Amino acid sequence: MLKIEVADTFFKRLRGLIGRNNLPQGCGLLIAPCNSIHMFFMKFDIDAVFIDKNFTIKKIVENVKTWTGLAFCFGAWAVVEFSAGEASRLNLVVGQKLEVEINT
């Protein structure tokens, strides 16, 4: 089960992962609502996993680069950001439902 932190307020979504050096394996940040991301001010590359309200994966964008990366998914409700390489390591695929443990 994936451990997920939630960014569901304006300021939490605005900050996202800015200022962090990494995310541990199996951990991610859920930004909701959100269907696009940028990588300005980020310190590490990420995998962006766009999901619907049922946590079904709609799109996976791997290895989004710091400062230059952008990713979006029309129709997505949210995005879960993981450290780069996690989507592959976890064998995530489009259509799969994410099983998550929400950390508050």
What spans do the regions from the language model cover?
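Compact, glycine-rich, soluble single-domain proteins
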Residues: 1-104
